[in-house]
């Protein structure tokens, strides 16, 4: 990587605050504008970095440290409470096992749906489908409902999809899941 390589992620002062209520009644009062007794819990506070093309970033920490929260913010599946996040180019993610796959649809149908979700035209997905299926090593199982798949099969299909679309940023939460399920 050279210093001139463009940034694919820019994060400045990023934070995520959750509002915690002691009871459902307190939450309802807040929604109705009657009283707000919520406590604030900052899962992340003042996170800043840049990631450039060709770089890798590992996020490690104790349980509850905010690792998954950060990755969800970067992927765009969660909104920040504070700060700025700029994504340049396509960002794809594997955040939870099978997230985004409909269990009653076949693997092939899920590929088409997921492709449209990440902004690929149907023709592009049709062109990529065979190579994704081959890389996933699912064979004929790709035409069965995803609910019949083992967790390893789901992970292989998701990984084959997100790598085939050649994203500028690939986000994977709990990478050990991918390696233990596929080896």
PLM region descriptions:
Residues 28-31, 92, 112, 124-141:
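Conserved ABC ATPase "signature" region
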Residues 60-62:
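The feature captures the beta-strand-to-loop junction immediately N-terminal to the Walker
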Residues 68-69:
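Conserved Walker
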Residues 75:
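Helix-to-loop junction immediately C-terminal to a conserved catalytic motif
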Residues 81-84:
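Conserved coupling/switch loops of ABC nucleotide-binding domains, chiefly the family-specific signature
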Residues 1-45:
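Pre-NBD coupling/linker segments of ABC/ABC-like ATPases
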